[in-house]
Amino acid sequence: ASPQIDPFLLERVEVLKGPTSVLYGQSPAGGLLNQVGKRPTATPRNEVGVEFGTNDHVRGTADFSGPIDAEGKFLYRFSAVGLSEDGQFRTTENERVALAPSFTWRPDADTSLTLFGFYQRDPRSNSYGGVPPEGTVLPNPFGRIPVDFYDGEPGFEQFDRTQKSVAYDFDKRFDDTWSVRLNGRWLRTEADYDSVYANGLAPDFRTLFRGVATSREAMDSYTLDNQVEGRLTTGPVNHT
C-alpha cells in the first residue's frame, strides 16, 4: 500500500541529500525526496492538456488556479488527471483518476491558511511480471519469447489502489522577530492486489514456474510539523 502521487499534481520535487532525521523524522541516511504539491496562485492560470501514444495511451490533464475575490484574500487551485492505456504485456491495462483541490485564505499580509485535498484511484495497473532470460537475452531451443509475453493469470490477477488525503498549512508572522508555521496531514491508502508471476524456466526450456502473491492492505498516516521561528541579534551575530 505504498502511496504514489501522480507527478502532474506536484509543483516540484526537492532532493534533500544526507541525513535529515532531525528535521523530518526517520529517513534513510543518504537523503530523501520531498514532493511539493501545487498551491493556489494569485495570478490566474488555466491549463488543459490531452496526449495520445502507443498502446492506446490516452491521458488528460487540467490545472486551474487564481483569486476568487477582487482583493486576492481567497485563492483556489484545482488539478486533475485521467489516464487509460494498455500495459506492456498482453491483457494488461493502466487506469488512473486523480484530483487535487486546494484553497488559500489570506486575511492580511502576515497570515495565511491553505487547505489541501487529494484523491487518486488506480483501478488497474500493469502486471509486475516479466520474461525469463532463456528466450530473450539467452538462447532457447524453442525460439524467442515475445516482449509482450504475459506470465500472469487473467482470471485471478487484479490491482486496485485508492489514496485520499486532507492537509493544512498555516503561517503567521507576529512581528519582525517571531513567526509560527503549523502543518498537518492525514493520508489513507488502500490496496487490493493479486498477482501470478514468472519464477524461472524448467530444465526443458518450455515449462514456466510461477509464483503467487496476494495482498489486502490499508494504511493511515498522520503527520504534524509545528515550528516557531525567532530572529534575534546579539552584538554582531544574527540568530534564527
What are these regions (language model features)?
Residues S2-I5, L23-Y24, V36-K38, Y222, ...:
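Short, flexible, glycine/charge-rich loop motifs used to bind or transfer phosphoryl groups or to couple energy/partner
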Residues R45-E47, K73-L75, D110-F116, D171-R173, ...:
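Membrane-spanning beta-strand positions in outer-membrane beta-barrel proteins
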Residues L16, T61-P67, S79, S102-R106, ...:
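Transmembrane beta-barrel domains of outer membrane proteins
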Residues F8-E11, V22-L99, P107-T111, K164:
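Outer-membrane beta-barrel translocator/receptor signature
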Residues L83-G87, A100-R106, D110-R173, R188-M219:
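Acidic/polar loop-and-plug regions of large Gram-negative outer-membrane beta-barrel proteins
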Residues T61, T92-E93, N183-R185, V196-A198, ...:
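Composition- and surface-driven signal marking solvent-exposed, interaction-prone regions
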Residues V166-T189, V212-T240:
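Face-selective signature of the C-terminal outer-membrane beta-barrel domain
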Residues A1-P19:
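Periplasmic plug
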